[in-house]
Amino acid sequence: MGTYGEFTDIAALQDCHNPFDAFALHKAALIACGIIPAEGGSLNSITDRIGGLYLSTQMHNVPKGSGLGTSSILAGACVKALFKYFGLPCTEPDLYNHAMCMEQIMSTGGGWQDQVGGMTEGIKYITSAPGNRQILSVRHISVPEPALRELQERFALIYTGQRRLARNLLRDVVGRYLGNNPDSLYALEEIQRMAAMMVFELERGNIDGFAELLNKHWELSKMIDAGSTNTCIDQIFAAIEDLLDGKMICGAGGGGFLQVILKKNVTKEMLRERLHETFEDCGVDVWNCTLV
């Protein structure tokens, strides 16, 4: 973004509730990691103790509002950098919890799924027990090597050309849940079951079965929040329906990226050509991606 700022007033550093502030994430990292208090205090006394601090972040080629969890991943990177700077050990739970705390401080909402998904390698099945303190269980899925290669070949990311802010969508989802909306409660229960079934199909090496479940997950997501899709997303999926075995949004939806499983013998170049023919000069495109 090429944005630079200097802060000599602690109140300005503590003001991190605007997610459009270029430095909101950096400020939240300082508060979440206990470098500065959430309110009050003296910046001079803090800098005298730690000798000042220069915090620089870079993120290349990923648009804002992508749905790929980049803000949570960048939050985790800030946490890890601060822990290392002060010579403190940093476990994976430390990363997850501090990143989630930062999101609450910035008022963007969210949970732990983005940081766990983005900062831990591999395909994972992530669960937590009920309660205010979220203790996570991260299980790495063992996918047979031939199936993993097939998934890499058939999996594609499509950018919609639209930006969305997850905070607004998440508030709608939480509101429907707290209001005991029957469709939302049913869909949330089914999504948990769907995730376990996806693990089963991946461990069997059944990519077609996984793709079918991805489609069901997409229908359930729309039951939870109609804002997860829009005219643009519907048109993109309609234009490439004959090329796909599975489709789903990334993140909260409403823009950002879409994830798809291509039919066998359909290449990403064929997908790209179809999108370019249908959507000219509007940012809709296939992005290169690799499973790690």
Could you describe each region identified by the protein language model?
Residues M1-R49, K84-T91, N97-G109, Q115-I249, ...:
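C-terminal nucleotide
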Residues F7-Q14, L53-K64:
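Glycine/charged-rich beta-loop-alpha catalytic/anionic-binding loops adjacent to active sites
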Residues D9, M59, T70-S72, S221:
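Short linear Ser/Thr-Pro motifs
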Residues V62-S66, L244-K247:
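Short pre-catalytic strand/loop immediately N-terminal to key active-site residues, enriched for Gly-Thr
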Residues S66-L88:
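DPxDG-like acidic metal-binding loop motif
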Residues L68-T70, K247-A252:
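Short glycine/threonine-rich catalytic loop with a Thr-x-Gly-x-Asp
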Residues G256:
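Conserved glycine-rich beta-strand-loop-beta hairpin in the small C-terminal domain of fold type I
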